[in-house]
Amino acid sequence: MHRENYFSKIAFCLLGVLFLSCITSVQTVSGDAASHEERMNNYRKRVGRLFMEQKAAQPDAVKLPSGLVFQRIARGSGKRAPAIDDKCEVHYTGRLRDGTVFDSSRERGKPTTFRPNEVIKGWTEALQLMREGDRWRLFIPYDLAYGVTGGGGMIPPYSPLEFDVELISIKDGGKGRTAEEVDEILRKAEEDREDM
C-alpha cells in the first residue's frame, strides 16, 4: 500500500515537471515570435527612414515639416487648392518602397473621387497644397500613411509609400487656399530645404 502511494507520488511529480517544462517551452516559443516581430518592425522603421532620407535628398524634392516629401511632375493652372471637405477627382498610382504597385486608378482606367479628410494623413496634407491640374509624386512616411499596422494585406507595418497623384478637378471650384497662398507655403518649404 505504501509502495503504491510512493509510486503514485513519483508519477504525479514527474507529470508536474513535464507540464512545467511544456509551459516554459511554449513561453519561449511565443517570446521568440514576439522578439522576431519586434526585430522585423525595427528593421522596417530603419529601412523606411533611409528611404525617406534618400527621397528628400533628391534635387527636385521638397520636404514639408510633417516629413512628407514631394516632387512636382506637372504644374496645374487651378486658382485654388481643395479644402479638407471638398470633393476631389484624382488619378493615382500607389507603390511600396520597392516599387510594387498596390493600387492604381490609372490601371482601373477611371479616376477616383473623395474628400481630403477621407484619406491617409499624407494625402490630406498634400491635396490641400495642390491645384487643379497639379501632378505630384508623394513620398509618405509610415506615420502619415498606414502606420504601425499596415493596410489591406499588401502594405506591411511601418511602410513608407510612394504615390503619383494628379488632381484632375475640385468639385464646385474648391474652398481651400488660393494659388498664391499655396505658392507662398511651398516657397517657404523650398527655402527651408536650401537652408539645410
Swiss-Prot record:
Catalytic reaction(s) noted: [protein]-peptidylproline (omega=180) = [protein]-peptidylproline (omega=0)
Q: Which InterPro entries match?
A: PPIase_dom_sf, PPIase_FKBP_dom
PANTHER family to which the protein is assigned, alphabetical = 39 KDA FK506-BINDING NUCLEAR PROTEIN (PTHR43811:SF19), FKBP-TYPE PEPTIDYL-PROLYL CIS-TRANS ISOMERASE FKPA (PTHR43811)
Q: Where is the PPIase FKBP-type domain?
A: 85-171
Specify the protein name: Macrophage infectivity potentiator
Q: Which UniProt keywords apply?
A: Isomerase, Rotamase, Secreted, Signal, Virulence
Q: What does this protein do?
A: Essential virulence factor associated with macrophage infectivity. Exhibits PPIase activity.
Top-rank lineage group of the source organism: Eukaryota
Family, according to the entry, reads as follows: Belongs to the FKBP-type PPIase family.
Q: What's a single GO CC term here?
A: extracellular region
Enumerate the subcellular locations listed in this protein's record, separating them with semicolons: Secreted, Extracellular space
Signal peptide residues are 1-29
Q: Which SUPFAM superfamilies match?
A: FKBP-like
Q: What is its EC number?
A: 5.2.1.8
Single GO molecular function: peptidyl-prolyl cis-trans isomerase activity
Q: Could you tell me which Pfam families the record lists for this protein?
A: FKBP_C
